[in-house]
């Protein structure tokens, strides 16, 4: 439960219809197994103590008494268990039979949640035996003790106040207004569903989308435990289709037609953070659902949940291709609007033969195609200087030619040398002044050419560079429209690769592939033996790490210690712990002290959930202190 993670389980035990003693043993065995796997919340199917398919046997007092006794036995079995258990059971209250989920913890029945919506159509006829639960929760006397009874009961962990669990039962989630909606609005961060949903053709897909969608709508974790093998097959088959979702993502899913327990970790801090950020997720003004406190030890667990190395890049190849096409279109549409609005005659792109300027040129060409404008009006400017290599220079020229742009070369070495003379800088001093003078000279050239041609300077810098401040202030940092400003470096590479893969021009494809093979570099220092001497990732760290840090820091507001924990797990065998911590420290420090560059960014289109525009997604003061974040890093022990 440290850093918000809690291990949860959805269990489908082997049962026998109406064989309550057998079912009780199976449930207790599953509880034991779940505890051995460090699960803190365990959810069982609907009416699993007796079996869902007992039919009119539910009218038999002997079965109902056996179920009540079984509930007491299972409750006692949890006494030494540090977990919250939800189990489905039929229960008679005031001569009426209710379909109930019992919440159990450390030998106590915390509450009895009733089923609200009883299906009575098709293969279902629950109203024949059961009564729908009351409209509002209350209390009943059970085994000599008062116990909360009714819909939407909230169970809150005393050791982690953000962990609030509520239950609903099968059909409840299929209804127009599921009880979980009210529960979430009153604070529930995890919904459990004890279900008995039979298998018919295509129903698994609908069920999966339903649970995924409900977790997204509620911004919650959702644990769905379904009945499986052992239920009667007189008319139906149950597949044990268990699902665990979090805010629109399926984290764990059982293989159907095999009784099993599935596990994953829910991130409660992430859920709470998303709700806090989402201003349309409003909490109920009037609280009507009771909160029942339960104890749970705080401990660190080994994470089994996987996190993507490249969170900005879809892992599935087909989805990645679709996403790349969509992103390129968004970028081009943004630029198209700006070109038309300003009545610009030309688009001026500084090209270096690197990834970012390549993507900017591709996007500009696409925008011109959308407008129906001659791509000769794209002015691709190459500005070789002290650090330019033959490889990048050739690639820049070939690319401009194959895309149909007008190539212009402006050598800036003499201008920069004269500038050094003017300001009294020694050209042998390869300090930041040496580097930034070149970047600013290039920007001046581009701006002046744009003025001379009634054009617009297209920015090439990407979001990863902006996060790190890896840009020269008022140099490559500045443009008239930044098409790459919301594209992280790891995604830039895939966008260029996608463009290479789909082009029908073999010469363009060849040059794009060579750009992909070229080390990332600003080329501001002289080359060594004709090769790039200044490699960005040697200086500021691997971009795949920085993009990982950027995503989890901005998307979910994770603290550095939590990001470090996820990175160590995700990049195990790729980077040492020391390396991960070193570059995470660099990221946090630079992210704060380079905000002044982001505070005056040019306009540019947003393309994803993480963006750094000071006018939109990220409004941060330039003089904020990083001390709290750095102290969190200092707590990490290697």
What are these regions (language model features)?
Residues 7, 161-163, 220, 229-232, ...:
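ATP/NTP-dependent adenylation/nucleotidyl-transfer catalytic domains that generate, transfer
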Residues 1-350, 366-375, 407:
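Enzyme catalytic cores with a strong preference for nitrogen-chemistry domains
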């Amino acid at each position: 439960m440290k850093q918000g993670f809690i291990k949860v389980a959805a269990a489908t035990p082997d049962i026998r219809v109406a064989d309550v003693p057998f079912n009780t043993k199976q449930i207790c065995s599953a509880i034991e197994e779940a505890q051995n796997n460090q699960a803190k919340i365990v959810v069982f199917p609907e009416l699993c103590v007796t079996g869902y398919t007992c039919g009119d046997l539910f009218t038999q007092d002997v079965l109902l008494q056996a179920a009540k006794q079984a509930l007491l036995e299972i409750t006692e079995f949890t006494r030494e268990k540090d977990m919250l258990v939800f189990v489905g059971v039929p229960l008679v209250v005031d001569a009426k039979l209710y379909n109930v989920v019992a919440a159990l913890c450390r030998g106590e029945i915390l509450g009895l949640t009733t089923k609200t919506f009883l299906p009575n159509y098709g293969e279902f006829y629950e109203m024949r035996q059961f009564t729908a639960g009351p409209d509002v929760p209350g209390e009943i006397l059970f085994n000599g003790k008062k116990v909360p009874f009714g819909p939407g009961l909230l169970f809150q962990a005393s050791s982690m106040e953000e962990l609030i669990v509520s239950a609903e039962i099968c059909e409840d989630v299929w209804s127009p207004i599921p009880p979980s909606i009210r529960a979430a609005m009153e604070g529930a961060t995890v919904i459990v569903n004890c279900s008995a949903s039979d298998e018919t053709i295509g129903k698994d897909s609908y069920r999966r989308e339903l649970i995924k969608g409900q977790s997204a709508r509620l911004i919650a974790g959702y644990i769905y435990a379904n009945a499986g093998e052992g239920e009667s097959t007189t008319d139906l088959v149950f597949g044990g289709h268990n699902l665990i979702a979090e805010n629109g993502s399926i984290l764990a899913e059982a293989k159907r037609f095999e009784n099993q327990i599935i596990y994953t970790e829910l991130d409660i801090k992430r859920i709470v953070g998303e709700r806090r950020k989402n201003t349309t997720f409003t909490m109920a003004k009037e609280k009507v659902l009771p909160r029942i406190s339960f104890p749970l030890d705080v401990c660190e667990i080994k994470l089994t949940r996987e996190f993507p190395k490249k969170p900005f890049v879809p892992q599935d190849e087909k989805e990645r291709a679709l996403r790349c096409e969509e992103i390129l279109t968004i970028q081009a549409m943004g630029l198209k609007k700006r070109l038309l609005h300003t009545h610009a005659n030309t688009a001026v792109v500084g090209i270096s033969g690197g990834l970012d300027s390549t993507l900017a040129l591709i996007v500009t060409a696409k925008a011109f195609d959308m407008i129906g404008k001659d791509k000769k009006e794209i002015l691709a400017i190459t500005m070789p200087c002290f650090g330019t290599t033959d490889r990048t220079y050739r690639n820049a020229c070939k690319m401009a030619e194959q895309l149909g742009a007008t190539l212009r070369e402006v050598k800036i070495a003499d201008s920069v040398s004269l500038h050094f003379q003017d300001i009294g800088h020694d050209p042998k001093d390869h300090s930041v002044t040496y580097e930034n003078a070149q970047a600013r000279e290039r920007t001046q050239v581009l701006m002046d050419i744009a003025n001379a041609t009634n054009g617009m300077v297209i920015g090439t810098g990407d979001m990863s560079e902006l996060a790190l401040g890896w840009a020269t202030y008022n140099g490559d940092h500045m443009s008239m429209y930044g098409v790459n400003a919301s594209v992280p470096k790891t995604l830039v590479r895939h966008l260029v690769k996608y463009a290479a893969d789909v082009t029908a021009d073999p010469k363009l494809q060849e040059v794009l592939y060579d750009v992909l093979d070229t080390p990332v570099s600003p080329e501001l220092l002289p080359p060594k033996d004709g090769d790039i001497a200044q490699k960005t990732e040697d200086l500021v760290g691997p971009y795949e790490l920085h993009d990982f840090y950027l995503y989890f820091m901005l998307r979910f507001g994770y603290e550095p210690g939590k990001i470090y924990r996820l990175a160590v797990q995700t990049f195990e065998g790729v980077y040492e712990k020391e390396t991960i911590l070193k570059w995470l420290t660099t990221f946090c420090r630079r992210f704060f002290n380079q905000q002044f560059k982001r505070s005056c960014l040019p306009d540019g289109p947003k393309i994803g959930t993480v963006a750094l525009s000071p006018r939109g997604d990220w409004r941060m003061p330039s003089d904020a202190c990083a001390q709290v974040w750095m102290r969190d890093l200092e707590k990490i022990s290697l």
